């Protein structure tokens, strides 16, 4: 299995910059990721009661979804800076600790990211690099790094 090395990190960082876009695009992008996640694991919505996870168009959920992608954005943009990335992943791990998020929810989120990014980028997309680097980020959030 491919590792998330410097080259993979730089590729993902560059492709993420193109896929993530800006402004209103980001809202649609984050909603697409969460809808794809909930389609795979509908029961995961219960983790988001406080932010109206039953309605991905609710302003509270949109704000939450964008905060999550903001964290992912920081993680991806520091893939080529291991010390900074570790700090960010440690911070995200603390935020997720105690929530007992099953691994299959992380898997569904990763699948959603890969799907939405691929749809956004078409052929200019290195699936193996994304696969390795999203695993690396999620392992850090789960505390397996």
UniProtKB/Swiss-Prot annotation:
Residues given in the record as heme b binding sites: 96
GO cellular component terms, semicolon-separated: extracellular region; hemoglobin complex
GO MF entries: heme binding; iron ion binding; oxygen binding; oxygen carrier activity
Globin domain location: 3-145
Keywords: Disulfide bond, Heme, Iron, Metal-binding, Oxygen transport, Transport
Keyword Heme: yes
Xref: InterPro entries: Erythrocruorin (IPR002336), Globin (IPR000971), Globin-like_sf (IPR009050), Globin/Proto (IPR012292), Haemoglobin_extracell (IPR014610), Mb-like_M (IPR044399)
Disulfide pattern: 4-133
Family, similarity comment: Belongs to the globin family.
Subunit structure: The extracellular hemoglobin of the earthworm consists of 12 subunits that have a hexagonal bilayer structure with a molecular weight near 3.8 million. Each one-twelfth subunit is composed primarily of disulfide linked trimers (chains A, B, and C) and monomers (chain D).
Protein name in UniProt: Extracellular globin-2
Organism: Lumbricus terrestris
């Amino acid at each position: 299995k491919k590792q998330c090395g410097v080259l993979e990190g730089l590729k993902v960082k560059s492709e993420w910059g193109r896929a993530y876009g800006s402004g209103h695009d980001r809202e649609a992008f984050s909603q697409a990721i969460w809808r794809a996640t909930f389609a795979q694991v509908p029961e995961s919505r219960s983790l988001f009661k406080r932010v109206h996870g039953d309605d991905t168009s609710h302003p509270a959920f949109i704000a939450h979804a964008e905060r999550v992608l903001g964290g992912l954005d920081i993680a991806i943009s520091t893939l080529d800076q291991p010390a900074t990335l570790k700090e960010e992943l440690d911070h995200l791990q603390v935020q997720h600790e105690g929530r007992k998020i099953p691994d299959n929810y992380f898997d569904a989120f990763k699948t959603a990211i890969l799907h939405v990014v691929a749809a956004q980028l078409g052929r200019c997309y290195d699936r193996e690099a994304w696969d390795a680097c999203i695993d690396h980020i999620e392992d850090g959030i789960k505390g397996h790094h």
